Amino acid sequence: MLLTWILLAASMPALQSSGDKPAKSTQPTDPTEPRRTRGLAYTHDLVEEVPWSIHLLKIDRSRVDYQFHTTMAKPSGFGLSRLSEQIKSVPREWGQPLAAINGDFWKDGRQYDGDPMGLQIKESELVSGPCARACFWIDATGQPHATNVLAQFQFTTPDGLSASFGINEERTNNGAVLYTPTFGASTHTKGGRELILERTGDSHSDWLPLGPGKNYTARVREVRDKGDTALLRDQMVLSLCPEWLQRFSRLTAGAVLKLSTATTPDLHDVNTAIGGGPMLVRGGKAVTFSGSQPRHPRTALGWNDNFYFLLVVDGRQSNLSVGMTFPELADYLVKKGCTEAINLDGGGSSTFWVRGQVMNSPCNGGEREMANALVLVQKPKTPGAPQTIDPP
């Protein structure tokens, strides 16, 4: 096995391209234990006998100036774009992007291309609701979590009728979806009934951007018996399927609805979350998987009390890397010290960006477009705060 590594400091320039060959070290230190003062350590592990090409970034959790954010493919509305393009859209106030990996699985379809399959919270905004897969989120104290999240989204009419709804997704033939301007220019729906919602007169009540674990009061501004309603600033649209028209026939302009974005567990104070799954490591032990376990390119996120671990395994390239099964991936993460780890979207989506360049070899020959990503940034210095400079 050939192991190569690079230590990264926030003050270092972007790494130079090394093609399929791992870059050579320039620092004489133990590759398995990065200096905590530097905060980051990248390793490229080549296991030639399989073969595997494994890219791992170890992040010191004591660095309070490091922070995770989620990105979207487009500046306005759902869609698809390459990871390197999403990095370019990171706002200056977040800080300097240091590393990024692809995020959640996403819906592939003309009208709803780029709809994340699971949960996404971006800067405290509930962009996409959870599904039946595991999610990763960071609570208000900075502690990471990963488990299934149950949506309890519900609207209630003035006469006491209640029903559940989804958020920013394709509406089914038996349900309701709440659309926000973050989704795009319009709802892309066909048929049914759509209620254009506006804030009530209370300017102090919660409104947009939509947040998790909150209660909202909304007034029906207009009722449309057509689909594809425009999504205007400071308005939401509640889209009802055709089968529900009779049930909610008494909803007219002026009606006031109660909306809840509750979840279990409660995510009301969460700033960053992203969907994925399945879980790979729990309590320091690899999760057990049954049935056929094929090898594919993989992306994963793990952690312990001291470090985060971002990992991408290349795959579907017989001369470089064949990919990993879930059990192989889980075992590898345990050996690296993870006590918790979650799988993210893989296959052609698996992409690893560090300090200005894509470090891995995506299986389609280049970056694939994706719906969202998880980005690590170094927060800007607080004006007047002592300057801390990483050693060269």
Spans of features found by a protein language model:
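Bacterial N-terminal signal peptides
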Residues: 1-10
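Gly/Ser/Thr/Pro-rich low-complexity, intrinsically disordered segments
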Residues: 10-392
